[in-house]
């Protein structure tokens, strides 16, 4: 199978390395210098340093070439750009006049200005593209790059997209499950990043494992309420792309969103934290969108509200936690 991966960040690079072990894979990035480095060293020293990439993996900075590769009859196109760049990439694909027949995206979050999920952005920009879906689940790019075991879910209303994605990714140490709840999978992948910031704050303040467990559990309830209101199925949120991804992102030391929370608890400013990370922390980008959607649906999301207070309103982390503890008692 031919596979084009659009986006050479940590996640796109790790997935491309996995795919290249079995398929004719081309990794694209618009940054010519990044591509030149990949071609010379077979390592993404900027985003996934220390991980050797397969010799068979090819690289290109020309979008047209990547799209042509991913538009072959037996091909798959993987969109690994962040949500913030998704609409621009879709427009570039449309302008290039070469939209692949089968597309799967791996980005997580809501578009900041519109509060749209990735599938809604793609439907608006590429309305003729009908075989598409989302690949998500509890996964750190570095571990995938190291070939460690991982389980992911592809969700699509298109059986052709599910089958093509399964055939591409399900090999080696990667196990793929299939489903059709695109909204539920996307909401889980977006909201868990915000909740991971909350658990990072609690851990950074030394509040203990009891507090962490409470935040994860009540955070899952927030995720489920919002996801169901937006059209997702409740059972999706107890699976890999909901609870599974939440546990990993809230507790794993490789989690950028958890790191943001830890550093906020240590008194660092958000700007300094993001500057030092050098990578996207989607929980920061989509926290306000999550809260706005919750309010539009009249859904209570106190943990998300507390995170937004710390990120954007100058609320001290300890005061935000105190506010959660002062909430009225209620039935679970």
Swiss-Prot record:
Indicate where this protein is primarily found: cytoplasm
Tell me which UniProt keywords the record has, alphabetically: Cytoplasm, Lipid biosynthesis, Lipid metabolism, NAD, NADP, Nucleotide-binding, Oxidoreductase, Phospholipid biosynthesis, Phospholipid metabolism
Q: What is annotated as the active site? A: 192 (proton acceptor)
Taxonomically, the superkingdom here is Bacteria
A GO molecular function term, named singly, is:
NAD binding
The reaction(s) this protein catalyses:
sn-glycerol 3-phosphate + NAD(+) = dihydroxyacetone phosphate + NADH + H(+); sn-glycerol 3-phosphate + NADP(+) = dihydroxyacetone phosphate + NADPH + H(+)
Binding residue positions for NADPH: 11, 30, 108, 141, 256, 280, 282
Which SUPFAM superfamilies does the entry link to? 6-phosphogluconate dehydrogenase C-terminal domain-like, NAD(P)-binding Rossmann-fold domains
Q: Which GO terms describe its cellular component?
A: cytosol
Q: Cellular location of this protein?
A: Cytoplasm
Residues binding sn-glycerol 3-phosphate, per UniProt: 108, 137, 139, 192, 245, 255-257
Q: Which Pfam families match?
A: NAD_Gly3P_dh_C, NAD_Gly3P_dh_N
* Pathway where this protein functions: Membrane lipid metabolism; glycerophospholipid metabolism
* This enzyme's EC code(s): 1.1.1.94
Q: Name one GO biological process term.
A: glycerol-3-phosphate biosynthetic process
Q: Which NCBIfam families match?
A: PRK00094.1-2 (NF000940), PRK00094.1-4 (NF000942)
Q: Which family does it belong to?
A: Belongs to the NAD-dependent glycerol-3-phosphate dehydrogenase family.
Q: What does this protein do?
A: Catalyzes the reduction of the glycolytic intermediate dihydroxyacetone phosphate (DHAP) to sn-glycerol 3-phosphate (G3P), the key precursor for phospholipid synthesis.
Annotated protein name in UniProt: Glycerol-3-phosphate dehydrogenase [NAD(P)+]
Its lineage reads: Bacteria, Pseudomonadati, Pseudomonadota, Betaproteobacteria, Burkholderiales
């Amino acid at each position: 199978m031919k596979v084009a991966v659009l986006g050479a960040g940590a996640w796109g690079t790790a997935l491309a390395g996995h795919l290249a072990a079995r398929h004719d894979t081309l990794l694209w990035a618009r940054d010519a210098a990044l591509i030149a480095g990949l071609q010379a060293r077979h390592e993404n020293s900027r985003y996934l340093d220390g991980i050797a990439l397969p010799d068979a993996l090819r690289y290109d900075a020309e979008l047209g070439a990547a799209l042509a590769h991913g538009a072959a009859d037996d091909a798959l196109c993987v969109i690994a750009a962040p949500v913030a760049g998704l609409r621009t990439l879709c427009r570039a694909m449309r302008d290039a006049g070469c939209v692949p027949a089968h597309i799967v995206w791996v980005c997580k979050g809501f578009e900041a200005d519109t509060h749209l999920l990735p599938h809604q952005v793609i439907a608006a920009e590429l309305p003729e593209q009908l075989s598409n879906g989302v690949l998500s689940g509890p996964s750190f790019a570095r571990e995938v790059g190291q070939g460690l075991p991982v389980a992911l879910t592809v969700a699509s209303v298109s059986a052709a997209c599910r089958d093509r994605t399964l055939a591409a990714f399900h090999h080696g140490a990667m196990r793929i499950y299939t489903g059709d709840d695109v909204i539920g999978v996307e909401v889980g992948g977006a909201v868990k990043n915000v909740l991971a910031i909350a658990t990072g704050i609690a851990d950074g303040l030394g509040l203990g494992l009891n507090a962490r467990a409470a935040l994860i559990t009540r955070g899952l309830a927030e995720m489920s309420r919002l996801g169901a209101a937006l059209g997702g199925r409740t059972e999706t949120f107890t699976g890999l792309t909901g609870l599974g991804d939440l546990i990993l992102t809230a507790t794993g030391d490789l989690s950028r969103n958890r790191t943001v929370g830890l550093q906020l608890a240590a008194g660092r400013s958000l700007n300094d934290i993001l500057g030092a990370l050098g990578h996207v922390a989607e929980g920061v980008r989509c926290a306000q969108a999550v809260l706005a959607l919750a309010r539009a649906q009249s859904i209570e999301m106190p943990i998300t509200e507390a995170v937004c207070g710390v990120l954007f309103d100058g609320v001290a982390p300890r005061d935000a936690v105190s506010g959660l503890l002062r909430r009225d008692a209620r039935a679970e």
